[in-house]
């Protein structure tokens, strides 16, 4: 009976160890790249490169934040940028709306 309990415990610990091992390396594998094509798809940028297993996007991506709609024709029509979060500023986008953006 003791041998059976010990065998079941060893199998359970082995199963748990394998599960954790696969989960840890599965998370890391998602952040890595093998070819430039992987990076082109991730960055949505034809100039992206895979360097030492890490994607490097050639162009900067613009982050936008949703704000209340303010109509504009130029950036001067938008309110002061101090109303935007840090490192953001107001810009008049093509659709004629002021939006806080970060470049």
UniProtKB/Swiss-Prot annotation:
The keyword Secreted applies. Disulfide bonds join 33-50, 39-55, 43-57, 72-92, 78-98, 84-100. It comes from the Eukaryota. Coiled coil: none annotated. It is found in: Secreted. This is Defensin-like protein 290. Residues 1-29 form the signal peptide. One of its GO terms (biological process) is killing of cells of another organism. Belongs to the DEFL family. Transmembrane segments: none annotated. Keywords: Antimicrobial, Disulfide bond, Fungicide, Plant defense, Secreted, Signal. It comes from Arabidopsis thaliana. GO terms for cellular component: extracellular region.
């Amino acid at each position: 009976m003791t041998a059976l309990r010990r065998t079941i415990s060893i199998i359970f610990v082995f199963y748990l160890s394998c599960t954790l091992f696969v989960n840890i390396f599965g998370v890391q594998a998602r952040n890595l790249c093998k070819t430039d094509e992987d990076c082109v798809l991730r960055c949505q940028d034809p100039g992206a490169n895979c360097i030492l297993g890490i994607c490097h996007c050639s162009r900067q991506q613009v982050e936008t934040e949703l704000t209340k709609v303010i109509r504009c024709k130029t950036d001067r029509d938008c309110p002061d940028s101090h109303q935007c979060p840090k490192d953001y500023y107001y810009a008049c986008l093509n659709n004629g709306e002021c939006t806080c953006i970060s470049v």
